[in-house]
Amino acid sequence: MGTSNTQKPQKQVPKRKKYKNLFSLKTKKKRGKKFSKRKKGGTLTLPVIPPKSIFILLKSRNKKIYDRKIIDYKNRSLLQEYIYFTGKIIPKRKTGITTKQQRYLTKAIKTARILGLLPFVKKEKGFFR
């Protein structure tokens, strides 16, 4: 008279990943680090776009900006971090900064080059006698 539940517990099969095509298996690559390996000590310092007013900088207390540097053409140490040894500007995809920051950085680097603060090309041994 009693109805008993005699169902067997089903095994849980792990779901397989579905790929759209066979080529996607071969083309998957691991992406490298966004920061260049030029420095032995650590990563690049993140730049900050200069505010139009100093009051804007003081109001934003919730953002941690103490470890960042403001983009300026006079700040050689910051600008040299975003330039290769050959003198080329490091692209945005390698540094991991935003498009707006890259634009400001490029303008600052070009201004510093014109004023003679940064070199246009690398210094070769045979060039300077």
UniProtKB/Swiss-Prot annotation:
Keyword hit for Plastid: yes
Any one Gene Ontology cellular component term annotated for this protein: mitochondrial small ribosomal subunit
Keywords for the protein's UniProt record, in alphabetical order: Chloroplast, Plastid, Ribonucleoprotein, Ribosomal protein, RNA-binding, rRNA-binding
Gene3D superfamilies in the record: Ribosomal protein S18
Top-level taxon: Eukaryota
Any GO molecular function: small ribosomal subunit rRNA binding
Subcellular location: Plastid, Chloroplast
A Gene Ontology BP annotation from the UniProt entry: translation
Chain spans, region Disordered: 1-20
Subunit-level organization: Part of the 30S ribosomal subunit.
UniProt record similarity statement: Belongs to the bacterial ribosomal protein bS18 family.
PANTHER family: 30S RIBOSOMAL PROTEIN S18, SMALL RIBOSOMAL SUBUNIT PROTEIN BS18M
NCBIfam families membership: S18 (TIGR00165)
Protein name (database record): Small ribosomal subunit protein bS18c
